[in-house]
Amino acid sequence: ADDMMSFIKSDIIVFGIGVFLFIVATLWFVFRKLIWIIVPISSCFFSVIIMIGILGLLGWKVTVISSNFIALMLILTMAMNIHMSTRFLQLRENYPNKNISELITLTTRKMFWPILYTVLTTVIAFLSLIFSEIKPIIDFGWMMTLGLFTSFIITFTLLPSLINFVPKENISLVKYEDSKITSYLAKISQNNNIIIFTITGFIIILSLVGISRLEVENSFINYFSKNTEIYKGMKLIDEELGGT
């Protein structure tokens, strides 16, 4: 049990830090301004904190399966925040005479339905997990569903409030020169339709063959390293008492 708790805590820390660094790098690549890294990350941070508090109040326990919900929440919330922030900056450029409050209102109106549809489709995917017969998987489905709705609410409440405090001189969209990579890929897709469809069809066939060869791993003991106490204990039970 002690090993199990250690693994869960380790996963939360490792994946949390990894996702945080990835998010910072992504935001810097997109916005190139420190303030536009701080604002979306603050929104993500509060979403996760609120969700953890809700789980605590509901008495839901984090398991090996659901231990990565924080990393998933950060990624999904960040996607919403980037859409909102980018749209706000685009509207700022298109309507320079409007004040910040008007731009925020316009942004939320334009982005509400697109982001809502995105959230609902993702929620449906996670809700499919509740039809499993394994309780930790069912709980994970409910956790992510609740987490997505929490992130959605934060994106349309806290994020606009934070944007309202951004200094005016930092409200501008970074202009990029035409990318050689995207131009090259565009030419390939326009001039090689038949080849692309042929390769895609071949890959689909290979994927179907691979799917037919998938096997389910039902040995819980193999989830852990051989030098851990939990592995040694379960191996002893497997060999001496007929299985875990």
Q: Where on the chain are the PLM-derived regions?
A:
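Membrane-embedded transmembrane helical bundles of large multi-pass transporters/channels
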Residues: A1-S219, Y223
